[in-house]
């Protein structure tokens, strides 16, 4: 059971997990773990399933998925009957008023819909994956010099579940460098998997880019793929000026993760998010929602 803090209602919601029984079997049984290592974490499996999700045959899954997870159709730019494949639905666009952007330059917004952990004054050699499991930023980036720039900074970890809006956005005006791609495996990023696979984020396929933001310093975006995520698509143009709320990219089918790193003394994360992280609970956030302020 995954409990997520609802910031508006100030209560804990129980997350309904897509493929819950399947995930438990894969990551908790000897047979499932063997199947995971031999097939599921491999590129060919995600590529094969990705092709199915791109096909017109997968479109029949859309309506049931929306109903099962109570996803708000009113936010979509298309009717559910207009999606040509499951991926077409998965990386759907939303109406302009579905995720309003706070234009105040001192306000830090969420880059995506998801579940958020926040870590301040980070030790880049002992970043928290889950309680008891850590990884290092230089392992994640394979770039020690860049990693050291974020000593004592802030790490924001956004977990995107399959039910979420899967486009991600810029948190400020600025210029973003070209993404650096790092090949890897395709483990799930569900908490069930995070508790079982050491250094999972360093194992999975990922991309990172440096965003030279106008108000929050040099922000490091790390986009991590997961099981069945055939592609991480960057839709921005590198080294061209963007404005707060502009789209940066999207994930194809599967759960996925976005990790933001801020330099020391650049931001203050909202108190409730920090408190819930310390208690071991994620906070549910929407793209454009206030999550902190400029220091």
From Swiss-Prot:
One of the GO biological process terms: phosphatidylethanolamine biosynthetic process
Cofactor(s) this protein cannot do without: pyruvate
Enzyme superclass (EC): lyase
Cofactor, free-text remark: Binds 1 pyruvoyl group covalently per subunit.
UniProt-annotated location(s): Cell membrane
Membrane topology per record: Peripheral membrane protein
Pathway annotation: Phospholipid metabolism; phosphatidylethanolamine biosynthesis; phosphatidylethanolamine from CDP-diacylglycerol: step 2/2
Site annotation Cleavage (non-hydrolytic): residues: 255-256
Active-site feature positions: 113, 169, 256
GO molecular function per UniProt: phosphatidylserine decarboxylase activity
Pfam families membership: PS_Dcarbxylase (PF02666)
Keyword field: Cell membrane, Decarboxylase, Lipid biosynthesis, Lipid metabolism, Lyase, Membrane, Phospholipid biosynthesis, Phospholipid metabolism, Pyruvate, Zymogen
Enzymatic reactions: a 1,2-diacyl-sn-glycero-3-phospho-L-serine + H(+) = a 1,2-diacyl-sn-glycero-3-phosphoethanolamine + CO2
Record-listed Pyruvic acid (Ser) modification sites: 256
UniProt modification remark: Is synthesized initially as an inactive proenzyme. Formation of the active enzyme involves a self-maturation process in which the active site pyruvoyl group is generated from an internal serine residue via an autocatalytic post-translational modification. Two non-identical subunits are generated from the proenzyme in this reaction, and the pyruvate is formed at the N-terminus of the alpha chain, which is derived from the carboxyl end of the proenzyme.
Similarity comment text for this entry: Belongs to the phosphatidylserine decarboxylase family. PSD-B subfamily. Prokaryotic type II sub-subfamily.
Matches recorded under NCBIfam families: PRK00723.1 (NF001941), PS_decarb (TIGR00163)
Protein name, entry field: Phosphatidylserine decarboxylase proenzyme
Species of origin: Clostridium novyi (strain NT)
Gene: psd
């Amino acid at each position: 059971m995954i409990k997520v803090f609802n910031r508006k209602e100030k209560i804990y919601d129980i997350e309904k997990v897509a493929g819950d029984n399947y995930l438990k079997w894969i990551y908790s049984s000897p047979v499932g773990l063997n199947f995971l290592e031999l097939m599921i974490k491999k590129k060919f499996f995600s590529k094969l399933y990705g092709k199915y999700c791109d096909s017109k045959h997968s479109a029949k899954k859309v309506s049931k998925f929306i109903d099962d997870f109570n996803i708000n159709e009113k936010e979509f730019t298309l009717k559910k009957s207009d999606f040509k494949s499951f991926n077409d639905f998965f990386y759907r666009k939303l109406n302009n008023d579905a995720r309003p952007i706070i234009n105040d330059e001192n306000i830090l917004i969420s880059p995506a819909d998801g579940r958020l952990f926040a870590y301040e004054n980070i030790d880049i050699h002992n970043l928290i994956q889950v309680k008891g499991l850590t990884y290092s930023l230089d392992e994640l980036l394979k770039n020690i010099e860049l990693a050291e720039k974020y000593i004592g900074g802030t790490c924001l970890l956004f977990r995107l579940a399959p039910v979420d809006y899967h486009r991600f956005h810029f948190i400020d005006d600025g210029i973003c460098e070209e993404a650096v791609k790092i090949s890897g495996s395709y483990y799930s990023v569900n908490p069930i998997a995070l508790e079982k696979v050491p250094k999972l984020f360093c194992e999975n396929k990922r991309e990172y880019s440096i965003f030279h933001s106008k108000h929050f310093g040099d922000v490091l975006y790390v986009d991590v793929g997961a099981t069945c995520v055939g592609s991480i698509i960057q839709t921005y143009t590198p080294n061209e000026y963007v404005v707060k709320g502009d789209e940066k990219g999207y994930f194809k089918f599967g759960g996925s993760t976005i990790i933001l790193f801020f330099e020391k003394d650049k931001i203050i994360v909202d108190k409730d998010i920090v408190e819930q992280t310390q208690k071991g609970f994620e906070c549910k956030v929407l793209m454009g929602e206030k999550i902190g302020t400029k220091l």
